[in-house]
Amino acid sequence: MSHTVKIYDTCIGCTQCVRACPTDVLEMVPWDGCKAAQVASSPRTEDCVGCKRCETACPTDFLSIRVYLGAETTRSMGLAY
């Protein structure tokens, strides 16, 4: 089943989500819009197992990273018709 990993602009570049991911779905990439000059990216979403450890590791008040599991993807992201 396919999962969607969404990274929001509230990412503070702390790398906690990257370190928490057991399947190396995430990586940090340079970004000038972040205090840390880097932001999380999810180039390998096909490897996501949906464990949501990245969400749990995120220290921001509003989770900067969210994993939407299969069928909940369009509904949770507000894309359902």
Swiss-Prot record:
Annotated compartments: Cellular thylakoid membrane
Residues given in the record as [4Fe-4S] cluster 2 binding sites: 21, 48, 51, 54
Binding site for [4Fe-4S] cluster 1: 11, 14, 17, 58
Listed GO biological process terms: photosynthetic electron transport in photosystem I
Domain 4Fe-4S ferredoxin-type: start-end pairs: 2-31, 39-68
Pfam families for the chain: Fer4_7
Record protein name field: Photosystem I iron-sulfur center
Organism: Nostoc sp. (strain PCC 7120 / SAG 25.82 / UTEX 2576)
